[in-house]
Amino acid sequence: MLGAMTSRVVHFEIPIDDPDRAGGFYRTVFGWNVAKWGPVDYWTMTTGAEPGPGAEVALTPRAEAPEGVLVYVEVEDIDRALSSVKDAGGTVVTGKMPIPTVGWSARFRGTEGNLVGLFQTDPTVPIPGGGVTS
């Protein structure tokens, strides 16, 4: 079993068709601040004051998450977590992937077929080609 103190929901993605409409909806309903993140079609929403227990929410093109909301759970060691997924009867869908200067992510399906994301914080993940973030 992974450490209970670090296995909390830290991020989830909501598939969208219209970022302005979706951002306005969540801003109106929950008061979340919406901001475009980087050069890709990706928007983040702040759900609470740091360092509170709130999760980060993102709006992502529907094509990238056709099944609906995707919840990410923070783990201490993503490799160990993926091993635990397999040992418990789950299936790894997307193996360990880098998020430069942020950490690592992966996705799996549990025994009931639900898609769940994993996230490990690691600010040392390099930027491809040695570039810098803006």
Where are these regions (language model features)?
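Core segments of cupin and vicinal oxygen chelate
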Residues: 3-6, 13-54
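Short acidic/glycine-enriched loop/turn segments that link adjacent beta-strands
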Residues: 39-42, 65-67, 99-104
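Short, charged/polar, Gly/Pro-enriched secondary-structure boundary elements
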Residues: 51-58, 113-116
